[in-house]
């Protein structure tokens, strides 16, 4: 048969060879026994994020490395909107907690340990942000409105945070992230924010892809038509035997069809 023109790039090939990657869901929900953090309301960062000062990123990363893991993906911001790094774009972050008297930076500490032990890093930065006022479409009085009359630009806010992390060499393994992990969950109604994926992905690759001198572009998960590593279709960790098969991408409509059939995404082997 004729050779298939669809072949993995260097990062996709390495993704398969790595075999073991850790996903570290770590944030306010860790201390509040909830999954998404929809009900924090006006509770302060110090109230919801109670990380003790003896948190040891070195032990966390060295344990993963010794267990054979090749990468750790860190939730820098989950749907609750809290940032585990010191962000200049929101007060809803670790600098306003009691952790190390507001001087701690969890993402930087994990990054330093990953650099020390040579463990690749992936960045989880949730596009859906329950806390951020600019998410969704609201007028100057905070009332729901149309996209055209929206007064605050969430897409710019998110892009600024991508720049803040990906453009700073203190984050990542030697300043590098091999993967950026997004998420399909999002709000509805006035909170049904449209995402400027093209702008975001230009920012990602500018700092972490070929444009930055890397061998291959940064891997993207949950990025619609830009996705380069796709979901298996469930959160049970069980994949279909055809999960290796390719997806069909519709760039015009910014969609990806991975032939989903509960509870798997099978792909197309033809």
Language-model segments: residues:
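Mature catalytic domains of secreted/periplasmic carbohydrate-active enzymes
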Residues: 1-270
């Amino acid at each position: 048969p004729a050779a298939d023109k669809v072949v993995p790039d260097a990062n996709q090939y390495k993704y398969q060879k790595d075999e073991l990657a850790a996903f570290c869901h770590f944030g306010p929900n860790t201390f509040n026994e909830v999954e998404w953090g929809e009900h924090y309301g006006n509770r302060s960062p110090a109230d919801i994020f109670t990380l003790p000062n003896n948190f040891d990123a070195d032990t966390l990363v060295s344990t993963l490395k010794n267990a054979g893991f090749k990468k750790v993906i860190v939730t820098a911001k989950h749907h609750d909107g809290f940032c585990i790094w010191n962000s200049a774009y929101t007060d809803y972050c670790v600098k306003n907690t009691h952790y190390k008297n507001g001087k701690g930076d969890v993402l930087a500490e994990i990054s330093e340990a990953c650099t020390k032990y040579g463990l690749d890093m992936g960045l989880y930065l949730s596009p859906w942000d329950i806390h951020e006022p600019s998410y969704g479409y609201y007028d100057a009085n905070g009332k729901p409105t149309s996209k055209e009359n929206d007064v605050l630009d969430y897409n710019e806010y998110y892009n600024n945070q991508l720049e803040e992390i990906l453009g700073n060499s203190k984050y990542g393994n030697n300043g590098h992230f091999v993967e950026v992990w997004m998420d399909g969950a999002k709000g509805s109604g006035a909170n049904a924010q449209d995402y400027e994926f093209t702008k975001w992905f230009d920012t990602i690759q500018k700092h972490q892809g070929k444009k930055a001198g890397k061998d291959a572009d940064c891997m993207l998960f949950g990025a619609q038509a830009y996705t380069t590593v796709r979901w298996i279709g469930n959160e049970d960790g069980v994949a279909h035997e055809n999960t290796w098969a390719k997806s069909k991408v519709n760039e015009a409509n910014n969609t990806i069809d991975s032939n989903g059939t509960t509870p798997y995404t099978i792909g197309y082997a033809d």
